[in-house]
Amino acid sequence: MTVSASKTAQQLKYIKDSIKTIPDYPKAGILFRDVTSLLENPKAYSASIELLSEHYSESGVTKVVGTEARGFLFGAPVALALGVGFVPVRKPGKLPRETISESYELEYGTDTLEIHTDSIQPGDKVLVVDDLLATGGTIEATVKLIRRLGGEVVHAAFIINLPELGGEARLTQQGIHCYSLVSFDGH
């Protein structure tokens, strides 16, 4: 293992160890992976931004899109590091300019996301960033918004992946390359 690979492995372990697991939250049987504990640790937070930025440094991405709300915390610094614009995708009524919206299914009901109509240009190569990949529903809705504006979603990046919930497989089937810093078993 090279020094660089060894450093990366150490950083990934440090990041994973900084994420607290809360049992039975928000309901019994769920193991909640709390990324806010990573944010409280500047060394782990910095390492996560560094690793994501390095991973996409040669990707040709022209925009980074972050989903509300924790996607902003990782997407905006990655966009700065890559020297590209950051675009927020938000809940309805939170963006001041003209928007388009996309509804998507939740376990119990539906939710909606919005994006400014002038934030993505036709041909933009987009990296979508969020804190956690579970079923992929939120990211799928985000991808639909970007594609409706003419953007090409080439990558999706996450701090945490919960592979058992199928989100990565769902997005991969749509031609989206997924990258996660760490994975956890269970829900």
Curated annotation (Swiss-Prot):
What domain of life does the UniProt record list for this protein's source?
Answer: Bacteria
Q: Which Pfam families does its entry note?
A: Pribosyltran (PF00156)
Q: State its location(s).
A: Cytoplasm
- Predominant location: cytoplasm
* Gene3D superfamilies per UniProt: 3.40.50.2020
Annotated Gene Ontology cellular components are: cytosol
Pathway(s) per entry: Purine metabolism; AMP biosynthesis via salvage pathway; AMP from adenine: step 1/1
For the keyword ATP-binding, the answer is no
Enumerate the Gene Ontology biological process terms: adenine salvage; AMP salvage; purine ribonucleoside salvage
Name the SUPFAM superfamilies on file.
Answer: PRTase-like
Give its E.C. classification number.
2.4.2.7
UniProt GO molecular function: adenine phosphoribosyltransferase activity
The record's catalysed reaction(s) read:
AMP + diphosphate = 5-phospho-alpha-D-ribose 1-diphosphate + adenine
Q: Which UniProt keywords apply?
A: Cytoplasm, Glycosyltransferase, Purine salvage, Transferase
Q: What class of enzyme is it?
A: transferase
Q: Which InterPro entries match?
A: Ade_phspho_trans (IPR005764), Adenine_PRTase (IPR050120), PRibTrfase_dom (IPR000836), PRTase-like (IPR029057)
Q: How does it assemble?
A: Homodimer.
Which family, according to UniProt?
Answer: Belongs to the purine/pyrimidine phosphoribosyltransferase family.
Q: Extract the PANTHER family matched here.
A: ADENINE PHOSPHORIBOSYLTRANSFERASE, PHOSPHORIBOSYLTRANSFERASE DOMAIN-CONTAINING PROTEIN
Q: Which HAMAP family match?
A: Aden_phosphoribosyltr (MF_00004)
Stated role: Catalyzes a salvage reaction resulting in the formation of AMP, that is energically less costly than de novo synthesis.
Give the protein name, as stated in the record: Adenine phosphoribosyltransferase
The organism encoding this protein is Yersinia pseudotuberculosis serotype I (strain IP32953)
Gene behind the chain: apt
